[in-house]
Amino acid sequence: MGKKGSGGWFSTVKKKVFKSSPKDSKRENNIGSNNADIWQQQHDTQEVVSFEHFPAESSPEISHDVESTASTPATNVGDRKHAMAVAIATAAAAEAAVAAAQAAAKVVRLAGYNRQTEEDSAAVLIQSHYRGYLARRALRALKGLVRLQALVRGNHVRKQAQMTMKCMQALVRVQGRVRARRLQVAHDRFKKQFEEEEKRSGMEKPNKGFANLKTEREKPKKLHEVNRTSLYQTQGKEKERSEGMMKRERALAYAYTYQRQMQHTNSEEGIGLSSNGPDRNQWAWNWLDHWMSSQPYTGRQTGPGPGPGQYNPPPYPPFPTAAATTTSDDVSEKTVEMDVTTPTSLKGNIIGLIDREYIDLGSYRQGHKQRKSPTHIPSYMAPTASAKAKVRDQGPTVKLQGTSFMPYWNSSTKNGSVNGSGCDSSSSGGAITTGYPGPRSPNPKSDIRRKPVSPSQSPTGFGKRGWRHDH
């Protein structure tokens, strides 16, 4: 589209159709120049052009045409028709111009939105920098506030955690003390009950062992009330007590052995038997120590010892009872027999064998005398029927001593005889008969002159206890 007043199609049509006067042409030129200036000014300032700037009624061409038509004289009909056609064409051109103006205004409006002036750009830049500065300052302030809150909250949380831990420690400490107090009370109650049971059991059942008490105590109880430490201490004390008792018994056996050995040595010297003096006594001590260490001590307990106030006597070699000595006269007659013509040294060995057999029982006799009254005679110490018959056959020369364990020397026969339960001394047939079905301590001197006999060769028929003397 061309500019108005610059030689467009509308001006060309108007010049050809209407030939205006010079005044009209000057006016039209002024109007066109004014319109061009207005358009240029609008384009430079980039203002939005509205449709109000181009009203259809105020068009200069239309007003000029109307004035020209009004001023023209209507002289002839042809001119009128021609004027009507020109008016119609002018109206159509005006409408086309209005449409073009509207399109141009729309284009200007759309182009003006995307374009900015330098002032607007500078203002926008200044505002953006200022707003960025404000945002950065707010961010720094926010960061400082967050750090301060973190520090304050961290200290507060730390203090709160420390306070909580202290409270928990105090609570645990109180619970521990309460539990310890309960355990102490339960322990004292159990200890008192245990002592009462021990006293009651010691008064009612003095011969009852610690094993039975232990089985009675093993009833359903609370496990935390059982004091294992006190039980272990009690067991250790009882074990030490039993060991001390064993040592005392051993010392008494040593002393009694030494005393009997000295008496036997003096008797041999008075009769004229061979004696070695102190060497023989020392040899007897060594032999007794060796024999006692080789024998199993069944009295030592591997389990818990006896309870307080109770005493279990250690087992000793059993005495030959009446049932053992009166089994059969044939058996007692088949024991080892020795001729009267036995040498004196062999007789001394036999006497020593009998002595040591009763020396080993010295400790038991001492404990037995403490427990039994002196007037009471047990059944195993009573003389048997065979012993009474042999004493009756022997005559009044030998006196039966049922309660004596000590061997005595018969000066008339020059033979050592022992009278007591389980030991028969007879002169009938010139033989010394000894019956010991129980275990005995071997004689160290007589071991060289006798050897064990197998069960098939044993003349007594007792198996391993049979001994054959080689003359």
From Swiss-Prot:
Descriptive protein name: Protein IQ-DOMAIN 21
Domain IQ, first and last residues per copy: 119-147, 148-170
Residue numbers covered by motif Nuclear localization signal: 2-9
Gene3D superfamilies: 1.20.5.190
Record GO cellular component, one term: cytoplasm
Gene transcribed to yield this protein: IQD21
Region (Disordered): 1-35, 54-76, 196-221, 295-316, 416-471
Source taxon at top rank: Eukaryota
Keyword Chloroplast: no
Biased composition (Pro residues): 305-316
Ranges annotated as biased composition (Low complexity): 416-430
Family, similarity comment: Belongs to the IQD family.
GO biological process, one term: response to cold
Keyword flag Zinc-finger: no
Function (record text): May be involved in cooperative interactions with calmodulins or calmodulin-like proteins. Recruits calmodulin proteins to microtubules, thus being a potential scaffold in cellular signaling and trafficking. Involved in abscisic acid (ABA)-mediated signaling pathways leading to the production of hydrogen peroxide H(2)O(2) and the subsequent [Ca(2+)] cytoplasmic oscillations-dependent regulation of stomatal closure. Required for [CO(2)] modulation of the cytosolic Ca(2+) transient rate and for high CO(2)-induced stomatal closing. Essential for both cold and ABA induction of XERO2.
Bilayer-spanning residue ranges: none
